[in-house]
Amino acid sequence: MSERLYIFDTTLRDGEQVPGCQLNTTEKIEVAKLLESLGVDVIEAGFPISSPGDFNSVLEISKAVSEPTICALTRAVKKDIDVAADALRLARRKRIHTGIGVSPQHIYDKLRSTPEKIVESAVEVVKYAKRYVEDVEFYAEDAGRADVEYLARVVEAVIRAGATVVNIPDTTGYCLPNEYGAKIKYLVDNVPNIDRAIISTHCHNDLGMATANTLSGILNGARQAEVTINGIGERAGNTSLEEVVMTLRCHKDVAVDTNINSRLITKASHLVSSLMNMPVQPNKAIVGRNAFAHSSGIHQDGVLKQRQTYEIIDPQDIGLNESVIALTARSGRAALVHRLELLGYDLTQEELDATYEKFLALADRKKEIHDYDLLYLVGDIDRMKQQSISLKFMQVTTGTLVPTATVVLKFGDHERMSTATGNGPVDAAVSAIKKLINEKVVLAEFLMQAITRGSNDVGRVHVQVECGSRTVHGFGAHTDTTRASIEAFLDALRALNVTEKIEEED
């Protein structure tokens, strides 16, 4: 029988620290509800002291989600803990996650302290957090570079103080897998009261070893893994939930498993990618669009004869179903509903109507609609519900002439038209839009990515727009890359809450 590994998802906290990946409270609740359906054990919902928005997100997620434990991060500061406890007051299951740096770099350089004072502070904050909640997790920040004997001393002290989980982070992604695993084993073998707490992994991917280090920790006794959807996270990212879960499913001899419903992995991956404007690289393990693609003739021959020759995971196990019904412009609603149900979506009538309309528009431009197309169509629903600015009409002239664009924007219940030239079709269209808004904005970054294959398939555009001291991100998807670019630009303008420029009277 397999031992239980608890999954601690920090997509909404560590994952959201990535520039441009900030979510509003409504979006965070949407992700949290999907994480609940996915079967995660703990959701780290935010860092309440950091901002009113984070505080409110933790509070609202506590009301919206009932099965997982809701966790709030703090520093080793009593005020942080007070605020976190307040944000968690409505949670059915609650945890405070507090801690302090334990490596020489943190003790001496960052904190200007001593090893003895760090132990005292660690014990003090754990005891203080226990006044509010029974479930207290202690993080030994930068444990990857800490002296292992000192680390064991800190861990023993905080467990004695009441910590129920001890988190051993490789904060900088420094460790080799054998080094990280050895640290976990040392704690298991040398901390007398280690049986009173769960050891947790929290690995960063700076050297590309986050998942390997996490698995090494699990093999040596850790029974909680801190992960994010798609491995999203600060700098080079965190351990990927999907990689840990599916590795354990493939290697049943490890005899450790999770409660994750793996058939929702693809849906979760696309939701997070869409809401956070963070495209998944095509060759990403498990959820990349090439993860189950076979181009070599030898590989294709083997897969056609027996999938297991080159596939160790059944695509259906992560919710990526093979098409039984080919969706085209002639497909009816029943076929679309069936396909969406296989992908894990249960839409309201209003959402289905919006999706079907967009589906038909896309199907008119493509021969067949694939699963990845549907995932992005559904992901667009919430963004399309409330549009203060929308594109009514666009015409672009390019080629050997000076690129010229004419756009018609809809502001509420009326329309405005503008024409401009530029260095290319996108530049011309952006210039035309700028004439119609009341803010001076700069298109600072532009990224285009193909969602599926083929010259007539969907392209996804991500932009970064600056307005004074504010920076926002937007995205758009369309078979017409110029149209996708404009939709992305308008998405960013909506985030800035720009309004219509008032025409000056003569």
Question: What is each model feature region?
Answer:
Residues 17, 30-31, 368-484:
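Non-catalytic terminal/interface segments that mediate subunit docking, oligomerization
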Residues 14, 18-19, 47-52, 103-105, ...:
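Short, small-residue-enriched loops and turns at beta-alpha junctions
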Residues 5-7, 17-42, 56-64, 78-199, ...:
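Alpha/beta enzyme core
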Residues 471-473, 477-505:
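Mixed-charge, glycine-accented linear interaction segment located at domain edges/termini
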Residues 4-5, 11, 246, 252-419, ...:
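A mid-to-C-terminal "edge-of-domain" accessory segment
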Residues 175, 182-305:
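Catalytic alpha/beta core domains of metabolic enzymes, predominantly
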Residues 1-77, 324-331, 337-339, 343, ...:
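N-terminal capping/small domains of soluble enzymes
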Residues 170-171, 226-234, 249-258, 319-325, ...:
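Short beta-alpha connecting loops at secondary-structure transitions
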